[in-house]
Structure formats: structure tokens, C-alpha cells
């Protein structure tokens, strides 16, 4: 096994750890889930570039008669990229004391101001940053509003 294979394995393990944390660990942290809302995806261009470059590496490894283990590892890396960028749905998870947004825990008392833009984006102003929450279904904004009213 070459150094390149070890680096690819490290990347696969890092992506796998992130996927496991996002799907299984994060919903169980900080209390029960009160509401989980799917969000709109950001640009898929980054994921397309990652998977495309990985496909180029697979092609290059095959044409240069590279080792089979490297080809398989690159294929697993491409599949992890497909899962993370296209299959996995980003979501905001509301808990009794706060919520997870982009895998970051935010307490409710950090919210200084909330606004709703014309295009259906919920804007939450925190102490030093602004969160732009783009929900997939516009009706979910009412669910978020009702939840925030009952918890505050």
C-alpha cells in the first residue's frame, strides 16, 4: 500500500465520520428532536467538481495501469462525494434549548432578531453573524415560527 492509498483512506474515513455524525450522532445530541426541516441545497457545483476530478483520477489510474486498490479507493471516494453532495439532505434540527444549523449548535438566546425576506428566506441575526435559512417547503416556515414562539 502506497502513501497515496493511505491519504485516500484518510479522506474516505474523514468523509465517513462526517456522514455518520450528520445522520446519526447530531440528532441525538442536546436533547430530543422537536422539529427537523429539510433545507434547500447550496450550489452543487462544488460537488460536481469534486466527483469530476475524482473520476479523472480514476481514469488516469486505469490508463496508467495503476494498482487496483487505488482504483477501488478512488471509486469509494467518488461514491462518498456523491452521497454527501447529492443524496444527503441538509436540514435544520430544532431541540428544546437551541438548534443545529450547518452542523453548528446555536442556543435560542443567541438570536437577537428574526426577519422573513420576500423570497421566503428566514434571516436570523445572531450576535456577530447572520443566518440565512432557506427551507425546501415554504410551509415549513410556519412550523418554525410556531416552534420558536412556544419555546421562547
Swiss-Prot record:
Transmembrane spans: 6-26, 45-65, 67-87
Keywords from the UniProt entry: Cell inner membrane, Cell membrane, Membrane, Transmembrane, Transmembrane helix
Pfam families in the cross-refs: DUF986
GO cellular component: plasma membrane
Record-linked InterPro entries: DUF986 (IPR009328)
Compartments it resides in: Cell inner membrane
Membrane topology: Multi-pass membrane protein
HAMAP family per UniProt: UPF0266
Family label: Belongs to the UPF0266 family.
Annotated protein name in UniProt: UPF0266 membrane protein KPN78578_23010
Record organism: Klebsiella pneumoniae subsp. pneumoniae (strain ATCC 700721 / MGH 78578)
Lineage: Bacteria, Pseudomonadati, Pseudomonadota, Gammaproteobacteria, Enterobacterales
Amino acid at each position: 500500500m502506497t502513501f497515496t492509498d493511505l491519504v485516500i483512506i484518510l479522506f474516505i474515513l474523514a468523509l465517513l465520520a462526517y456522514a455518520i455524525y450528520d445522520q446519526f450522532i447530531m440528532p441525538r445530541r442536546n436533547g430530543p428532536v422537536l422539529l427537523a426541516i429539510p433545507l434547500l441545497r447550496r450550489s452543487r457545483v462544488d460537488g460536481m467538481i469534486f466527483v469530476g476530478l475524482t473520476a479523472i483520477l480514476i481514469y488516469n489510474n486505469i490508463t496508467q495501469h495503476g494498482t487496483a486498490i487505488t482504483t477501488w479507493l478512488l471509486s469509494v471516494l467518488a461514491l462518498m462525494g456523491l452521497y454527501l453532495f447529492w443524496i444527503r439532505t441538509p436540514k435544520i434540527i430544532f431541540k428544546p434549548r437551541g438548534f443545529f444549523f450547518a452542523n453548528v449548535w446555536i442556543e435560542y438566546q443567541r438570536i437577537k432578531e428574526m426577519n422573513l425576506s420576500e423570497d421566503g428566506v428566514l434571516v436570523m441575526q445572531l450576535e456577530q453573524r447572520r443566518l440565512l435559512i432557506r427551507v425546501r417547503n415554504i410551509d415549513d416556515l410556519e412550523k418554525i415560527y410556531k416552534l420558536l414562539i412556544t419555546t421562547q
